[in-house]
């Protein structure tokens, strides 16, 4: 730790200790960027990524430098123009700072970092040359391959064909809509999971536009895509069970989707060999209540085994402590912004792996609009009770360190969502999504 030499006014002067230099500080001295937008994505996001890496359970100092350099060299150039008030903007569905959302995973084996981003083109901002932001996803994955990141490109290509807009479909939408005024035009996002020095890639795809053109509900397009990719029928049982449930909760026609309070919003999958891949179907529910959590957690009573019900009991405890405001949310018109009240709905995902008979569920609790520190103190107490002693002791101070220049007793937008899942083997598994 460096020491700032004190001015010796008297013998009682106490040395002042400077903050220890971090990998972010060191890299900031030597990294240069091609424009102010890239510079801003480094200045605004990299400090938090650096702190999350420092807090992670399995990142050596060398791996911290590795992941920050990868972000600077291979992710920032893909993020497009940084959002500036008064300039034409593009609504990334993630709702973080610009086109990226960091998140922190908590499990008994330790904490780890993930970030999700939408590769964004200048043409998507203007709404002219790339109105649905379709082209940058190919560039992003090509860049990752050149950088040595391993993933399954064939799975991406298969899903792209099934869910993303073709040139003809994009042109058809442009002929009938004022595209720049459309709230959400996203096609795909990429998530990068950091495991020590390794990186794994997930793909998120948004079905709304293509499903509308095909005149089928979102959930039907998503399940059809999984079935098309699943040539050997390894996901047949789980997708059939999920379809049976979704038919009871989601609209069955495109016309009904405009007023639906529950519907599928996107799907995700690991870009690995199909035998190891997990498909996840995400839905939201505008009715925020624990009764709705019970319905979706158990798939309307279809999931009623001991592990499912044990997880539900722990989730109930967490829900009661957090005191998330209940009620019906308005339809989502834009990502959350600083100063918003509790506007976000509940989210759930249903995970399916090859050979699974039934999906596994994860719940996402909306925290936007609630002061940060009360949430942090409740989470710290929860961590202590459920086998996360280090996180229980440190989380409040750690969160303050993530956002050192803000009054977290008042600020309400940084801890945006808390996801929760449960298994007999690992116990609670949680992720906090930071905006």
Swiss-Prot record:
Pfam families hit by this protein: Trp_DMAT (PF11991)
InterPro entries according to UniProt: Aro_prenylTrfase, Aro_prenylTrfase_DMATS, DMATS-type_fun
The keyword Transferase appears for this protein: yes
Bilayer-crossing regions: none
CDD domains, per database record: PT-DMATS_CymD
EC number of the protein: 2.5.1.-
Enzyme class: transferase
A biological-process GO annotation: alkaloid metabolic process
Binding-site residues for substrate, renumbered to this chain: 101, 206
An example Gene Ontology molecular-function term: prenyltransferase activity
Pathway(s): Secondary metabolite biosynthesis
Binding of dimethylallyl diphosphate, residues: 114, 202, 204, 280, 282, 364, 429, 433
Keywords: Prenyltransferase, Transferase
Organism domain of life: Eukaryota
Sequence similarity: Belongs to the tryptophan dimethylallyltransferase family.
Role played: Prenyltransferase; part of the gene cluster that mediates the biosynthesis of the benzazepine alkaloid nanangelenin A which contains an unprecedented 3,4-dihydro-1-benzazepine-2,5-dione-N-prenyl-N-acetoxy-anthranilamide scaffold. The first step of nanangelenin biosynthesis is catalyzed by the indoleamine 2,3-dioxygenase nanC which produces N-formyl-kynurenine through the catabolism of tryptophan. The two-module NRPS nanA then utilizes anthranilate (Ant) and L-kynurenine (L-Kyn) to assemble the dipeptide product nanangelenin B.
Protein's UniProt name: Prenyltransferase nanD
Protein species of origin: Aspergillus nanangensis
């Amino acid at each position: 730790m460096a020491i700032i030499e004190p001015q010796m006014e008297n013998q009682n002067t106490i040395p002042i200790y400077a903050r220890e230099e971090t990998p972010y500080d060191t890299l900031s001295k030597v990294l240069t960027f091609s424009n102010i937008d890239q510079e801003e994505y480094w200045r605004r996001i990299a400090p938090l990524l650096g702190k999350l890496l420092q807090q992670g359970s399995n990142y050596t100092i060398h791996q911290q430098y590795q992941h920050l350099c990868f972000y600077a060299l291979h992710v920032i150039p893909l993020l497009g123009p940084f959002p500036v008030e008064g300039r034409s903007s593009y609504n990334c569905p993630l709702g973080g700072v610009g086109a990226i959302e960091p998140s922190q995973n908590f499990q008994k084996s330790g904490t780890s970092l993930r970030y999700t981003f939408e590769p964004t083109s200048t043409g998507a901002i203007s709404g002219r040359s790339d109105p649905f932001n379709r082209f940058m996803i190919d560039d992003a994955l090509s860049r990752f391959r050149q950088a040595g990141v391993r993933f399954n490109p064939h799975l991406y290509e298969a899903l792209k064909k099934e869910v993303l807009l073709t040139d003809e479909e994009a042109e058809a939408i442009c002929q009938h809509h004022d595209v720049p005024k459309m709230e959400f035009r996203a096609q795909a996002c990429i998530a990068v999971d950091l495991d020590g020095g390794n990186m794994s890639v997930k793909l998120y795809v948004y079905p709304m536009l293509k499903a509308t053109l095909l005149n089928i509900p979102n959930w039907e397009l998503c399940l059809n895509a999984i079935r098309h990719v699943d040539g050997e029928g390894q996901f047949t049982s789980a997708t059939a069970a999920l379809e049976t449930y979704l038919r009871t909760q989601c609209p069955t026609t495109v016309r009904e989707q405009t007023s639906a309070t529950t519907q599928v919003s996107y799907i995700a999958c690991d870009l690995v060999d199909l035998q190891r891949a997990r498909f996840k179907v995400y839905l939201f529910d505008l009715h925020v209540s624990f009764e709705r959590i019970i319905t979706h957690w158990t798939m309307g009573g279809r999931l009623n085994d001991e592990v499912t019900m044990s997880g539900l009991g722990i989730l109930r405890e967490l829900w009661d402590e957090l005191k998330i405001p209940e009620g019906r949310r308005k339809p989502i018109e834009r990502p959350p912004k600083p100063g918003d009240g509790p506007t976000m709905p509940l989210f759930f995902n249903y995970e399916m792996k090859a050979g699974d008979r039934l999906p596994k569920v994860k719940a996402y609790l909306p925290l936007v609009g609630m002061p940060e520190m009360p949430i942090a103190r409740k989470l710290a107490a929860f961590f202590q009770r459920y086998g996360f002693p280090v996180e229980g002791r440190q989380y409040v101070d750690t969160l303050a360190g993530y956002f050192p220049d803000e009054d977290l007793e008042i600020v309400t937008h940084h801890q945006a969502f808390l996801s929760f899942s449960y298994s007999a083997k690992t116990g609670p598994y949680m992720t906090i999504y930071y905006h």
